[in-house]
Amino acid sequence: MEPFRIHKGTAAVLMNDNIDTDQIIPKQYLKRIERTGFGKFLFDEWRYDNNRQENPNFPLNAPDRKGASILITGDNFGCGSSREHAPWALADYGFRVIIAGGFADIFYMNCMKNGMLPIVMDKEMREKLVKTDAREQIEVDLENEVITTSTHRFHFTIEKMWKEKLFNGLDEISITMQYEQEIKEYERRVATY
């Protein structure tokens, strides 16, 4: 997993509350287990019309929001069924940071496990962020837990364990591999039959 230290990017805004995992990526696209290739299906039923043409009224399709790597959204983001495909779709689309009023617990953990930083921020602060010019680079500094724009500086908090994993780019496999020697020693001591 790529370490997350400081991220600079533009933001896309989708301030709906209670966006569930089926809205993030509909179930018909969940037939694969690779982590890539899901970005084109992100918010599929909102982004495209019945002819698979981009819906010009959907915020992510706005020309000045293309290429955004920060998503600012509403409360209870990622609710619904627990499918890791939802964070995969967000990451594959290019998002590294999701700022919401709150997240479903499993979705929050799945974001972290896939190298994305989910930030909980109150509505007043998110509304200030939303007013940032679409072309402006927003800086997200994980080490100092700060989001900076040209006019504002916002503090956020993150649990120490998740912060260390993201900062050092550690997923569950790489954490296990840190104990490879101890695991091998244990396996040598265990009786085999």
Swiss-Prot record:
It holds the Pfam family Aconitase_C. Heterodimer of LeuC and LeuD. It comes from the Bacteria. This is 3-isopropylmalate dehydratase small subunit. It is an enzyme of class 4 (lyase). It catalyses: (2R,3S)-3-isopropylmalate = (2S)-2-isopropylmalate. Gene3D superfamilies: Aconitase, domain 4. Catalyzes the isomerization between 2-isopropylmalate and 3-isopropylmalate, via the formation of 2-isopropylmaleate. The keyword Glycosyltransferase does not apply. One of its GO terms (cellular component) is 3-isopropylmalate dehydratase complex. Belongs to the LeuD family. LeuD type 1 subfamily. One of its GO terms (molecular function) is 3-isopropylmalate dehydratase activity. Transmembrane segments: none annotated. InterPro entries: 3-IsopropMal_deHydase_ssu (IPR004431), Aconitase/3IPM_dehydase_swvl (IPR015928), AconitaseA/IPMdHydase_ssu_swvl (IPR000573), IPMI_Swivel (IPR033940), LeuD (IPR050075). GO terms for biological process: L-leucine biosynthetic process. Pathway: Amino-acid biosynthesis; L-leucine biosynthesis; L-leucine from 3-methyl-2-oxobutanoate: step 2/4. PANTHER family: 3-ISOPROPYLMALATE DEHYDRATASE SMALL SUBUNIT (PTHR43345:SF5), 3-ISOPROPYLMALATE DEHYDRATASE SMALL SUBUNIT 2-RELATED-RELATED (PTHR43345). Its EC number is 4.2.1.33. Keywords: Amino-acid biosynthesis, Branched-chain amino acid biosynthesis, Leucine biosynthesis, Lyase.
